[in-house]
Swiss-Prot record:
Co-factor: note: Binds 1 Mg(2+) ion per subunit. May bind a second metal ion at a regulatory site, or after substrate binding.
Cellular localisation: Cytoplasm
Molecular-function annotations in GO: magnesium ion binding; nucleic acid binding; RNA-DNA hybrid ribonuclease activity
Name under which the protein is recorded: Ribonuclease H
HAMAP family: RNase_H
Originating gene: rnhA
Region (Disordered): 129-150
Length: 150
């Protein structure tokens, strides 16, 4: 796989109220091209939108890829890179024996990751990272659309 096969993705989630109407956004860059994705849910949480952004971005790729995935959510990054193995081993329970929140999304995200080689990068939100700012704008657009504002 060459550098030109490398795909860079930024994802973000937003919520107006938590829970409340929310949106997700993703910016995908590859070989000089870009694709923007976004959507929303009228009743959700910020974490669910962060997770949905990753799932939708990865599922939009039509072949196994080498990806740098930029997220501003430590919940998403740590959940997939550190916590999920323990949750599965414990029957989807946390260390304090409580059910893992958003289990269906963790499972969908793990499945979406399987066919790709992913390097996870945490970026500070609202700190000038151009890709993150674009993903944030898309997530806000998704939120606005489910709230009936264009």
């Amino acid at each position: 796989m060459t550098d030109k096969d490398m795909i860079e993705i930024w994802t973000d989630g937003a919520c107006s109220g938590n829970p409340g109407p929310g949106g997700w956004g993703a910016l995908i860059r590859w070989n000089g091209h870009e694709k923007e994705l976004y959507g929303g849910d009228p009743a959700t949480t910020n974490n669910r939108m962060e997770m949905t952004a990753v799932i939708e971005a990865l599922n939009a790729l039509n072949r196994p890829s080498k990806i740098t995935l930029n997220v501003d959510s430590t919940y998403v990054k740590d959940g997939l890179t550190k916590w999920i193995k323990g949750w599965k081993r414990n029957g989807w329970k946390t260390a304090d024996k409580k059910p893992v929140k958003n289990q269906e999304l963790w499972m969908a995200m793990e499945e979406a990751c399987k066919r790709h080689e992913i390097t996870w990068v945490w970026v500070k939100g609202h700190a000038g990272d151009e890709g993150n700012e674009r993903a944030d704008g898309l997530a806000r657009k998704g939120t606005d659309e489910v709230r009936g504002r264009k």
